[in-house]
Amino acid sequence: MNRIAFITLGCKLNYAETSTYERALLKEGFEAVSWTKGADVFLVNTCTVTEHSDKKSRNIIRKLHRQNPDSLIFVTGCYAQLKKAEIEAIEGVTAVFGATEKSQIVPSILAKVRDQEYCPEGAGRFFPAYSSGERTRSFLKVQDGCDYKCHYCTVPYARGESRNIPIAEIIPQAEAIASEGIKEIVLTGVNTGDFGRTTGETFFDLIKELNKVEGIERYRISSIEPNLLTEEMIDWITSGTKFLPHYHIPLQSGCDTILREMGRRYDTAAFAHKIQYIRERTEVPGGPKVFFGIDVIVGFPGETDELFMETYTFLRDVVRPAFIHIFPYSRRAGTPAAERKDQVQDCKKTLRVQMLEELSAQLHAEFLESNKGVSEQVLFESTDRKGMMEGYTGNYIRISRPFDPAMIGKIVDVII
């Protein structure tokens, strides 16, 4: 019984943690296989950002048991933290691990497979993790948890309070990633920019130290709250560091009324200023444009057609991102927004999602057009898709070329 399959749902942070479990279990003699081909052990890392995420997790667990009735199924992740009893009630589940029990997962799997007893000595406050196995990019977990408690979100309850390990313990992880020949690191967390709560350090301190790691040539920040991305930080990032002109920033709404009711910590004027500040300090005539990926929630309680159009107009005329990541509001038990009586009809949410998807496609096409003829650097990846390989520019434009194994992991100058 040594074949194990990993199923990861949700964010890049989950992928980093799953990769860490995988490395530890491979060292113990396990063989990683595709979950579609059957395995002796399954580890499902769940997501709970929406009700759809919960349902998807349940369906996968049931499917695994139906297709592999004699296999062991272990479940972790945010859904496992919030609804542990609900998952334990699903037929075929061997064990469920919440947010504070991640350090117990590997020893528990080993004990079960080897028919041994395992007595946990206590849960760790922070579970270090980074992804590996790819030759070009790694996701490095630098922070966990969130203290913001926005009115629609259950993630703070699933992930716990904001916490991290010291910079001095993160740098060796980045060095280990570099030793594998990986050139790019994506910094991940639940509220990444809130790094330092438990160590008296700051996210700015962290990125300045990471910038010194030899062998890593590119960094991306997976997501950062606009109020935590300071002008001082932007000035440093744009001064010739290894950090790329690629920003993933949650807006959630382009309407100040809705932002206040969501419990967000900025208004549209502050957000617009931050976007403009980045552009002014990054973009030069004839050079690459900054990639902005923006998160937006549609259909938050109380969002009328007029208030939604404020968001639409703000995105179209002011922010003009390269990509909009759109979420229809999902009613999550235990949050203030779930108790409101002015819920928006699903049909209206669907229409608003469609409108923003069309806008996102238009803005992305314009972003690509604005970068045509520009010189950029591409890090090519190992995937062979029908004789082609792909890579990404610093500002996250996908570039394809005929597959050449010698180009894997190489950073190459191209004209877009």
List the predicted regions and their residue ranges.
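Proteins enriched for Cys/Gly/acidic motifs involved in redox and nucleic-acid/cofactor modification
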Residues: 1-194, 208, 232, 268-286, ...
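Short strand-connecting beta-turns/loops that link adjacent beta-strands
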Residues: 37-38, 147, 252-254, 384-386, ...
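Conserved SAM/AdoMet-binding glycine-rich loop
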Residues: 73-74, 82, 179-305
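Glycine-centered loop/turn positions within well-structured domains
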Residues: 103, 148, 193, 227, ...
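Conserved, mostly hydrophobic/aromatic
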Residues: 170, 187, 221, 249, ...
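Conserved N-terminal phosphate-binding loop of PLP-dependent enzymes in the Aspartate aminotransferase
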Residues: 215-216, 320-321, 336-340, 344, ...
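Terminal RNA-binding accessory module
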Residues: 339-416
